């Protein structure tokens, strides 16, 4: 069976998991409290009696080294950097501008509007490692305004006019693009870390992208069309969506300096 200190460690670990699920405080606070408890009580939670009895064993230094070991993990820093880019996309309005531009150019036909949603996700995905933030925070606030332009309402027969197709594409495009890029979703990065610790094999951003490229091309090109065929919208074309997108872009004004800097940082990071 497990040793006593391992069981105590497991108890604290379980408490952290429960805290992350229930979220009485933000998740970062729960994690820091858990790390602090284990580091402070390390003689009873982290190390066995045999380790503590070794000559020259300094549990204080070992505890501190364990507590900050995550900061030396390159995967953690990659996740952090990608989240910062995602926040920048949202705060500067660059993500919204890109999506509106594609909707304006491709929104005359419902099928092309589906491709606009897919391409918007495709552009945002490499630097937004949260599919929830990308889909719900950037894409959804835009596409939810499109169906009412054609009197297509949820929970109503009019939803099949265009709304159902657009919302379905929002969900599917989010899922597809999350698998294409290593930095499109945080679990992808964690998976690389687990793979490295288990098999000592490494997989770079380029390796992931090239491995997914053949399937990615098929998914990006076929999914909007398949959804259009299998779940066809009643409305096939219209001019209201492009006009609305153009109005929104005019309200945003020209590309500001913050957006230009964000775009430059994004291109530089990807290169």
Q: What name fits each language-model region?
A:
Residues 18-26, 120-130, 172-182:
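Transmembrane alpha-helix interface/packing and boundary motifs in multi-pass membrane proteins
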Residues 1-5, 102-111, 155-161, 251-257:
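Short, amphipathic, aromatic/basic-enriched membrane-interface segments that mark the entry/exit
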Residues 2-4, 15-33, 43, 67, ...:
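Flexible hinge motifs at transmembrane-helix junctions and intramembrane kinks/re-entrant loops
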Residues 91, 131-134, 150-264:
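Juxtamembrane and boundary regions of transmembrane helices in multi-pass small-molecule transporters
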Residues 2-3, 46, 60-69, 190-207, ...:
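Transmembrane helix-loop junctions at the membrane interface of multipass transporters and ion channels
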Residues 1-11, 72-81:
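Structural signature of hydrophobic alpha-helical transmembrane segments
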Residues 29-155:
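Membrane-embedded alpha-helical segments and adjacent helix-loop junctions characteristic
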Residues 11-18, 117-123, 170-173, 265-270:
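Hydrophobic, membrane-inserted alpha-helices
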